[in-house]
Amino acid sequence: MGSTSRKNYNQFFHLAGSSSIQKGTKTIVTLWNRHPEWPTLILRQNKKSFHVSAPNIQYIHDFLDDETLKKYQNTLGIHLCPSEAEGFGHYILEAMSTKALTLTTNAPPMNELITPERGLLVNYHNTKPQRLGTNYYVDPQNLEEKIEEVLAMSHQQRKEIAENARHWYLENEQFFRQKLVTFLQDL
């Protein structure tokens, strides 16, 4: 994904896409609506998803081509990823790859990717079985506290955590590629 653009660590981004129910979007929108003093949240989701008019939420309902989406991901510095469940964690890894300060759910596999050195973990308050896995529902109060924690950080603190995430992402990607090549050579 890369992180060549200048990051704005005062802007929040949430990529709900077509599965906003699983991405914690309703909780995010509810909190943003309660806090008009918070910076603008850029929220990409389908038009039919959860929607509340708030002066500090900018909705993007239109289809975004890859180049435009990458521009948002690479320039907006704080990514909200309070997923109820993740398969592999592509959503979170994309945020890490762009050197974003990432907030996600403190449950597996999300907390296997984001650690306190690489982002902020939001506690969950409820779980529910889903097929062979578990959905973890973030605690709205804890998410609010974590957002306030980010807002209280200096630009440098935000950037350092995001750089740690990017560094881990690059190391992990290199490790994966090496292991894959070794595995394929051994076949």
What are the residue ranges of the model-derived segments?
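C-terminal "capping" alpha-helix adjacent to the active site of nucleotide-linked donor transferases
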Residues: 126-159
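Short alpha-helical donor nucleotide-sugar binding micro-motif in glycosyltransferases
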Residues: 70-76
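Short alpha-helical segment that forms part of, or immediately flanks, the ligand-binding pocket
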Residues: 70, 93-97, 108-112
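A charged, aromatic-enriched C-terminal amphipathic alpha-helix characteristic of glycosyltransferases
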Residues: 138, 152-185
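Aromatic "clamp/platform" in nucleotide-sugar-dependent glycosyltransferases that forms part
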Residues: 84
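Conserved catalytic-core segment of nucleotide-activated headgroup transferases in glycan assembly
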Residues: 1-66
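Short hydrophobic beta-strand element within catalytic cores of glycosyltransferases
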Residues: 101-104, 111-114, 120-121
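A short hydrophobic beta-strand element within the catalytic core of glycosyltransferases
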Residues: 79-80, 103
